[in-house]
């Protein structure tokens, strides 16, 4: 059943508690358990729910997988009226509406994908108070006609999701979001909230200012996602590196692979498909129907890998994405957090895997500097890129470095990133840097990395012989290091902005003022060793993922039943039950309706709707 299709008749009763059901906190806990099947709130969910449930305003900054949606869904259910949710993407609206309906909540999404008859019916139900939550796009909520509909309705709360779209410096900027501050004047008595999963200090201030939330209470939670393993390595043969990663660590798993260009998206998806991986492309240049179909396959089926540009992701609410891979650099730490945060939203072990190289740095800098953006914006974007490069090149705990960018402190190394698991060290790399920069200077600053490395290693190539570069004093001074090591040196020099690259002239290297400071001994250089990796990769331990005492055969049968039920209901499998619920089901082996209803993620509606089928399977084992 489509999220936009009919579900509730006008006479169907709401699952929300009555106003005499106790305090806001008590009613919220009741809804949390009876509707969503959770026993307790995560911090700071309960504080936020109480704040808005009692009529206050709030700005919520939670990482992906932090339970952000519950922060506006529960206040909407404990207050009288209909909750209005402003969301930027149709897919995101439909996913959340499907999940809410599965839990017995009267929800609807009104968007351009509906026929006029269905839109009018939902508007009528909104005015008549027959909806608990309604999702709309910013363009619709700003239209005078729809605002008249809202004025004739009783609103419980107004939630502006993905609020970072208000930032003109952000990669998801939506001009319509800037105008949403007008809702404060139109509905002064309705509590408002803004929610986002990623925003640095300047973006947070911009959200508060543009949306008129100066009096709002701010709620934040750590950006730490300890279930996601962070890994960033040197790019060598990216497709082969990716395929090895998928085969060794994620066979049959759902995941997202990000590429910078549309052409690389299609090439990578086609190549993976030929190698036996079920891979689908996604980018803005594909026909709308192809994008919709590929996204639906990814959401509703298991073991699908989507290869995409950043056009894919913000509307994805799939909790069982086991990995996010980058074969190209994101634009900033915020983009990296936003994109990798789509992995492991169910709290189970997942991977954020990335490879990058010298050309990635040069390409990103060239794109920023060559854009038509104002100089101020270019400076901001270059600063953000340099912060990301610092994260990529750190020799200390990667998670500590990531969290420090957002002003957080992790007291101890995380133990779940590549730099913790395969320790690297920093060393005084001034001499190596001087050799590399000298090779660039003495060859006239007109060649690329490969030629400079050949000079350093003393390789007699045709180009070196033709240009008589074998006569240079720098020729052969780097024979003590291999080609991978010199590639790492040049990459790190570029990352530290100690070497210029002209992409318009085929990646020629040139020296900057900072380069000359290094050559003259006025600026020391710290480099890091490349991690020494075991030839035999350690494969993911299935027992860690499954948990103790779980029968893999039973879990497979539970997943098969879930898929059957999902097809019957016309929803993605995770909307029926998430992986975490199935794992607990396989481990606890409930035999009675009461035991089943006490499982994580099993609310009253799902216990009634799905309990008999799952209990029949469990009792047969």
Model region roles, listed by residue range:
Residues 1-28, 380-382, 411-621:
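Accessory DNA-binding and partner-docking regions appended to nucleic-acid-acting proteins
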Residues 47, 241, 387, 435-438, ...:
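Pre-recognition alpha-helix immediately N-terminal to the DNA-recognition helix
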Residues 17-35, 39-43, 47-69, 77-79, ...:
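Helicase motor core with emphasis on the C-terminal RecA-like subdomain
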Residues 375-408:
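Short, charged low-complexity linear segments at domain edges
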């Amino acid at each position: 059943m489509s999220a936009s299709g009919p579900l509730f008749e006008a006479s169907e009763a709401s699952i929300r508690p009555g106003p005499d059901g106790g305090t806001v906190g008590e009613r919220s806990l009741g809804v949390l358990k009876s509707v969503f099947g959770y026993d307790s709130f995560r911090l700071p969910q309960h504080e936020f729910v109480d704040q808005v449930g009692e009529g206050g305003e709030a700005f919520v900054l939670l990482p992906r997988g932090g339970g952000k949606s519950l922060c506006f869904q529960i206040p909407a259910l404990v207050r009288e009226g209909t909750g209005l949710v402003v969301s930027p993407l149709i897919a995101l609206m439909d996913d959340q509406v499907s999940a809410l309906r599965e839990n017995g909540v009267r929800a609807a999404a009104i968007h351009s994908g509906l026929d006029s008859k269905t839109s009018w019916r939902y508007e009528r139900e909104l005015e008549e108070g027959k909806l608990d939550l309604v999702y709309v796009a910013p363009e619709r909520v700003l239209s005078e006609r729809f605002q008249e509909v809202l004025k004739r309705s009783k609103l419980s709360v107004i939630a502006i999701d993905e609020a970072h779209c208000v930032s003109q410096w952000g990669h998801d900027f939506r001009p319509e979001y800037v105008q949403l501050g007008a809702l404060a004047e139109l509905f002064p008595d309705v509590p408002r909230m803004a929610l986002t999963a990623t925003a640095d200090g300047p973006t947070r201030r911009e959200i508060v200012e543009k949306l008129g939330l100066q009096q709002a209470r701010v709620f934040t939670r750590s950006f730490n996602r300890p279930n996601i393993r962070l890994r960033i390595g040197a790019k060598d043969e990216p497709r082969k590196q990716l395929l090895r990663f998928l085969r060794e660590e994620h066979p049959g798993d759902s995941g997202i692979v990000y590429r910078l260009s549309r052409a690389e998206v299609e090439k990578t998806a086609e190549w993976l498909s030929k190698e036996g991986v079920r891979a689908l492309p996604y980018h803005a240049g594909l026909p709308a129907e192809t994008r919709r179909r590929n996204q639906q396959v990814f959401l509703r089926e298991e073991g699908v890998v989507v290869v995409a540009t950043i056009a894919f992701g913000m509307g994805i609410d799939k909790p069982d994405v086991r990995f996010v891979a980058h074969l190209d650099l994101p634009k900033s730490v915020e983009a990296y957090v936003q994109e990798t945060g789509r992995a492991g939203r169910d709290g189970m072990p997942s991977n954020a895997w990335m490879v990058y190289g010298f050309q990635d740095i040069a390409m990103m800098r060239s794109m920023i500097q060559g854009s038509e953006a104002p100089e101020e914006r270019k400076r901001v974007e270059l600063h953000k890129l340099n912060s990301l490069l610092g994260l990529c090149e750190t020799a200390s705990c990667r998670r500590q470095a990531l969290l420090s960018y957002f002003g957080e402190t992790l007291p101890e190394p995380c133990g779940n990133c590549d730099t913790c698991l395969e320790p690297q060290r920093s060393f005084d790399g001034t001499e190596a840097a001087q050799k590399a920069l000298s090779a660039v200077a003495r060859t006239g600053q007109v060649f690329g990395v490969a030629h400079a490395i050949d000079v350093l290693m003393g390789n007699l190539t045709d180009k070196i012989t033709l240009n008589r570069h074998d006569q240079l004093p720098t020729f052969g001074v780097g024979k003590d290091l291999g080609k991978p090591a010199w590639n790492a040196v040049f990459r790190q020099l570029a990352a530290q902005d100690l070497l210029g690259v002209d992409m318009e002239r085929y990646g020629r290297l040139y020296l900057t003022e900072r380069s000359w400071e290094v050559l003259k001994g006025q600026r020391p250089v710290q480099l890091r060793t490349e991690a020494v990796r075991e030839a035999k990769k350690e494969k993911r331990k299935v027992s860690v993922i499954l948990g103790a005492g779980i029968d893999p055969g039973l879990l497979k049968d539970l997943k098969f039943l879930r898929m059957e039920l999902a097809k019957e209901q016309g929803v993605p499998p995770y909307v029926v039950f998430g992986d975490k619920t199935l794992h607990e089901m396989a481990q606890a082996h409930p035999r009675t309706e009461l035991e089943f209803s006490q499982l994580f993620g099993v609310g009253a509606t799902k216990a009634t709707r799905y309990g008999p089928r799952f209990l029949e399977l469990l009792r047969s084992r």
